Amino acid sequence: MEKINTPGVHHITLRTSDYQRAKQFYIDDLGFEVILEKPNLFIFFAGGTAVAIRGPEASTPSNDQFNPFRVGLDHVALGCTDEEDLEKFAAKLNSLQVENTGIKVDETLGKKYIAFKDPDRISWEYYMV
């Protein structure tokens, strides 16, 4: 079978339990810039990848919470090219009281990273490339 021809991931979409809380976290707290907003949806770029955040639908369970151990998404990792940026980001997460691991070294690849959770407990990493 021939390999799929793609320049990379175009976008990811995450469902949130609270649209306004998610918007405050990603836009106001983390500083991403909204590039498109429609009812119950906003999109920002993380590097060259669009990240779409959707609010809950009528069928979204009211007490639902992300679980990285279910089949599906485990976490999202953003690339970091400067160790000073990694340290600044860690300090920002701490100042915002965002749950995080502190800067660690990945045992598999030997790269530094910090893992954190958004308000719906979706796992993210800021990872040295």
Name the predicted role of every residue range.
Residues 1-4, 90-129:
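Vicinal oxygen chelate
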Residues 1-20, 73-76:
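N-terminal beta-strand motif that seeds the catalytic metal site of vicinal oxygen chelate
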Residues 20-21, 83-88:
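Short, conserved charged micro-motifs
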Residues 49-53, 61, 120-123:
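Short, charged/polar, Gly/Pro-enriched secondary-structure boundary elements
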Residues 58-64, 102:
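A short, acidic/glycine-rich surface segment
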